[in-house]
Amino acid sequence: DEVQVVAVENLPFDEYKRAMLSCDVLLDQLYSYTPAMNALQAMAQGLVVVGGGEPESYDLLGCADIRPIINVLPDENDVYEKLRDLVDHKARIPQLSHESRLYTERYHDHLKVAQAYVDFWQSRKN
C-alpha cells in the first residue's frame, strides 16, 4: 500500500511524459555515473531520481551543497535498500524534489549550457 510501481515500456514520448507526472520517484540508469536526459527531465519536473549520481559527478560541476540523486549500484540488493530507505523516510521526498529542480536549473539550464560553449570557444579564438 505504501508504493505504487508504474513500469513503462514502448510508450510514445508524450504518453511517457504524462506517466511521469503521476510519479514522485524515477528509477533510471543503474550503470551511469551521472544523470542522463531522462533523469534530468524527471528532475526538472521535481521527481526524485534513483540512479547514477556518483560523488565525482557533483564534484565535476562544483555542486557542493545538494545531492538530489539517490545513487545506486547496479545491484538488486542496493536498489532495494535505497528504495526501501526512501519509503521508510518519505518525509525526505519534498526536499529531494526541490533539490532536483534546483540542480537542473543550476547545472543544466539550456541557456547556461549554451553560454558555456560560447565562452569556451571564444576563449580559444584569442
Question: Model-predicted segments: where are they?
Answer:
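Active-site donor-binding acidic/aromatic loop of nucleotide-activated sugar
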Residues: 3-10
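Short hydrophobic beta-strand element within catalytic cores of glycosyltransferases
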Residues: 48-55
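Acidic donor-binding loop of glycosyltransferase active sites
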Residues: 21-34, 47
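Short acidic active-site motifs
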Residues: 14-16, 78
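A charged, aromatic-enriched C-terminal amphipathic alpha-helix characteristic of glycosyltransferases
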Residues: 91-122
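Short alpha-helical segment that forms part of, or immediately flanks, the ligand-binding pocket
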Residues: 17, 39-44, 58
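Active-site donor-sugar recognition loop in glycosyltransferases
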Residues: 15, 30-35, 56
